[in-house]
Swiss-Prot record:
A molecular function GO annotation: rRNA binding
GO cellular component: cytosolic small ribosomal subunit
PANTHER family found in the cross-reference section: RIBOSOMAL PROTEIN S15, BACTERIAL AND ORGANELLAR, SMALL RIBOSOMAL SUBUNIT PROTEIN US15M
Record's protein name: Small ribosomal subunit protein uS15
GO BP annotations listed: translation
Top-rank taxon, per record: Bacteria
NCBIfam families associated with the record: S15_bact
Pfam family, one: Ribosomal_S15
Binding partners and assembly: Part of the 30S ribosomal subunit. Forms a bridge to the 50S subunit in the 70S ribosome, contacting the 23S rRNA.
Swiss-Prot/TrEMBL keywords: Ribonucleoprotein, Ribosomal protein, RNA-binding, rRNA-binding
Length: 89
């Protein structure tokens, strides 16, 4: 369930802090959110795909960890990313 390169570049361009930024928490959270949304749609059709469900739970946990890190270190950036991605928190 990987993102295609064009979609990934678009997400990176939208959330990066500077030209070469591909690993900031905001970028990682945005990419994970897109992958989670894609996998959620897949699981609604293929509800017995437990292997993908495990991958989804792993990605959700990874995103949760990044969000916790961002909240502890920069609350304003945390609030911006949660609002822009429409995450519940």
């Amino acid at each position: 369930m990987a993102l295609d390169a064009a979609k990934k570049r678009e997400i990176i361009a939208r959330y990066q802090k500077h030209e070469n930024d591909t690993g900031s928490p905001e970028v990682q959270i945005a990419i994970l959110t897109e992958r989670i949304n894609h996998l959620t749609e897949h699981l609604q059709v293929h509800h017995k795909d437990h292997h993908s469900r495990r991958g989804l739970l792993k990605m959700v946990g990874q995103r949760r960890g990044l969000l916790n890190y961002l909240r502890e270190n920069d609350v304003e950036r945390y609030r911006q990313i949660v609002e822009s991605l429409g995450l519940r928190r």
